[in-house]
Amino acid sequence: MKILGIAVVAGAMMFTAGPALAAPIHGNASITCANGAIASGAYRNITVTGACSVSAGAVISVSGNITVTRGAVLDAQSAASTITVRGNVTALSSALLGLGCQPASYVGNSGHACTVDPLDHSTIAVNGNVTALNTGTVLLNGITVRGNITALGGGSEIPWSIKNNTIGRNVSVAGQTTNWLGVLFNDIGGNATLLHIAVTDTDPGAHGAFVVQNRIRRNLVCLGVTPTVTGGLFPGEPLNTVGGRALGQCAALA
């Protein structure tokens, strides 16, 4: 079941070790990562143009923004790290954005284990928004976002996971054609909206998009999701907690 085994994706995305990017001597410089691991340091902005990861145990602070350009990869979900972004994180067309990993024992559910050390966990906070625009893959696991998570378009054969996050405002996911998508165990301060999403996995246990045990302060809205939306694997499981209304295909999931 993908809801229990999303973390296996992390193993497939480990890169051949490249040279680590040295932290700026005086800090607060903007850098571009074309390959390899981003090391501990204080940066103004980080732009990812190739296949980049973060060093295990890295402590990274970004006073501005992180941008993952078209077709690039930011893997901050295979090795545990501490990342603080004062601005926004944006991933563009066909990119892969992976932020956060933690064991099941840390979160109390299936988790998303780090590949480098399955018992370790990330601490990642974004003060602004996380935005994915026609992005190939989005993996957000156990991070804090003070603004919005917005994913418009995109998709791939890699399952998408928005899981165990704390989001200050809204989660909006729309227009994907992707193998699998789960919005799971999140604390959402505003609305959660899923619109016009096609899930292509033919596994009989896939059940379309999963919207499972989220705490949503305002409304939960699901429209045009195919083949369906499900609130869990088994009858009688706890549903989503919604402070406003549950509407559309998610009307019965709260």
Regions found by a protein language model. Give the residues of each.
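N-terminal segments that cap or nucleate solenoid repeat domains
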Residues: 23-71
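Feature marking well-ordered beta-strand scaffolds used for ligand recognition
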Residues: 53, 118-120, 129, 244-245
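Feature marks extracellular polysaccharide-active and adherence modules
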Residues: 49, 55-57, 63, 69, ...
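Acidic/polar low-complexity surface segments
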Residues: 79, 91-122, 150-151, 155-161, ...
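Secretory targeting and sorting signals
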Residues: 1-22
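Small-residue (G/S/T/A) turn/hinge positions that recur once per unit in extracellular repeat modules
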Residues: 37, 50-53, 58-60, 72-73, ...
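Short, low-complexity, Pro/Ser/Thr/Gly-rich segments in the mature regions of secreted, periplasmic
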Residues: 25, 32, 238-254
